[in-house]
Amino acid sequence: MNKAKITKENIVKLLTQSDSLEFEETQNEGSFNFTDFFTNNREKIQNMTTASCLSFLKNRQSIMRVIKSADFTFGSVTIKKTRNNSERVGVNDMTFRRLDAMVRVHLVGMIKDNGSALTEAINSLPSHPLIASYGLATTDLKSCVLGVLLGGSLPLISSVLNFEIAALVLAIYQDAKHVELGIDMSKFSTKEAVGKVCTVLKSKGYNMNSVEIGKAKQYADILKACSPKAKGLAAMDHYKEGLTSIYSMFNATIDFGKNDSI
């Protein structure tokens, strides 16, 4: 039996006629591949410097609110405001999540290739709210890579060559330490995130060999040294000297313990 393409007309035949109809299993014209998307759209953000990428990540939440409030255009690209999460997004459409992942991959490329860019990242990343709340020390290339990926779409990023194991280890860390990290599992399933990353890796034929496991251990050692803090506690740390002084006015002391909830 000849296999048919998945078209509107053939779907109608499948639903309304008694003739047997088998579709081509390999047809996947509508699937999304972030690696291809990044390659095809990278020139749209090629003028972003290390500083501008770092600023984007540091102010991500505020930038996202502005971009998602209405149709947002930069250059020839328009990020359309979607009315709800079920609204269809095409494989070539720019979304904030895809743009965010592109900026992160672009930044990692710069800090890997340029020593001054790496130094700039080492100096800037500790001031980023999410990195501060994780207690992640960004002192070298690998720790900076983790810092740049933190908060991004790990399933998208894991599809890019040489990002696989870093994205997977970070996803597993967030799942294993979701309580300490203060992640609300009703809003974000860390286990599901690990599954999505693994699905991407399996679909691209990623081989988790001994070399990759060795890289995983290096990333895991960096993350094991983190001292996660609740957001409120991270902010309190910023005012540590002043808070200590004010508490003393009431003959009291303050505990800046790493895992306290505020």
UniProtKB/Swiss-Prot annotation:
Location of this chain's protein in the cell: Virion
Main location group: virion
GO cellular component: helical viral capsid; ribonucleoprotein complex; viral nucleocapsid
Alphabetic keyword roster: Capsid protein, Helical capsid protein, Ribonucleoprotein, RNA-binding, Viral nucleoprotein, Virion
Molecular function in Gene Ontology: RNA binding
Pfam families: Tospo_nucleocap
Free-text function comment from the UniProt entry: Encapsidates the RNA.
Family: Belongs to the tospovirus nucleocapsid protein family.
Protein name: Nucleoprotein
Origin species: Impatiens necrotic spot virus
Gene encoding the protein: N
